[in-house]
Amino acid sequence: MSVNRILVINPGSTSTKIGVFDNERPVLEETIRHDVEQIGKYKRIIDQYEFRKETILEVLHSHGINISKLNAVCGRGGLLRPIEGGTYTVNDAMLEDLKNGFSGHHASNLGGILAYEIASGLNIPAFIVDPVVVDEMEPIARISGIAGMERKSIFHALNQKAVARKVADELNHKYEDLNLLVTHMGGGITVGAHKKGKVIDVNNGLNGEGPFSPERAGTVPVGQLVEMCFSGEYYRDEMVKKLVGQGGLVSLIGTNDAIKVEQMVEKGDPEATLIYKAMAYQVAKEIGGASAVLHGKIDAIVLTGGLAYSKILVDEIKERVHWIADVIVHPGEDELQALAEGALRVLREEEAPKEYIVREKQTVARG
């Protein structure tokens, strides 16, 4: 089998994770920490790309990586327009939306830009894979009870789809042939209904929908939320933080550290026990609801993300959902590996690269 060498780039707010892979095998994985003062010199996140590019090239050189031997560069997908899942070739339309922050400004927007800037000089392809804006929801799943307020698909697409493919391999099937319920449990929690390779419904794990998590409130009583918003006691930003960042375990027990909470549970703390069980209860409830989306025809339930390392949490969830389908646990997440595998599927011609095309306010994927 021929070897494809792939450079993978995953930019964060103050760091850039890079990896070099020979097919699926990691040759180099490193987290480049950026000086906060250096980052602070740039007014816009997008202005950092040249600085980060040079830093990446310096690190590769220091490890003896000959970039002329690369076959492709793959970056973390940013805040683009809603698109279906898959591996996309970085093109001019995508670069424009990333640079202009069409759906928001975030460090992940640099992923596609950095991939393109490095790849174009080497005359090799640049890709992104399954960005957070992946949207494959069916029309019926978008409807809410208020006109003009559609449900949105915002979830851990990269890890959910990567783990779903691994489980499909373990079951000796193609991802596109299975119905899976995949639950990513980290700072936020999302439960995706994967129908034959498409995530046809998923809770919005960012903006207050689904189970509460270490840092996010999830679904809350809306009437009480409205009363709180108009009580005159809180600014808008404070309310947003109650939903994202200071919600969930942070609000209920004062920490986002699930390990600490689990230690409290093991010591018999009644409040911690109730709250931790409540989080598992809400995850199980979301899984149960998602099973109805797939008419109860489920090949497997998958638990992944950092919280899937918690035996207490996993056992509580299993106890409530094992009757629906077998529960498979893949703890943690490996975004660099997932990005490399997405690029590799295209290089091996196992799937065609998709094209990001903007037409009259909408984006279509062609591939």
Curated annotation (Swiss-Prot):
Which GO BP annotation is one of this protein's?
A: acetate metabolic process
- Which InterPro entries does this entry report, sorted A to Z? Aliphatic_acid_kin_short-chain (IPR000890), Aliphatic_acid_kinase_CS (IPR023865), ATPase_NBD (IPR043129), Butyrate_kin (IPR011245)
Annotated protein name in UniProt: Probable butyrate kinase
| Cysteine disulfide partners in this protein | none
Keyword Magnesium belongs to the record: no
Carries keyword Ion transport?
Answer: no
Taxonomic superkingdom: Bacteria
Identify the keywords attached in UniProt to this record, alphabetized.
ATP-binding, Cytoplasm, Kinase, Nucleotide-binding, Transferase
Q: Which GO terms describe its molecular function?
A: acetate kinase activity; ATP binding; butyrate kinase activity
Swiss-Prot/TrEMBL catalytic activity: butanoate + ATP = butanoyl phosphate + ADP
NCBIfam families in alphabetical order: butyr_kinase (TIGR02707), PRK03011.1-5 (NF002834)
A GO CC term? cytoplasm
What's the gene?
Answer: buk
- Chief location category: cytoplasm
What is this enzyme's EC? Answer: 2.7.2.7
Q: Which family does it belong to?
A: Belongs to the acetokinase family.
Q: Where in the cell is it found?
A: Cytoplasm
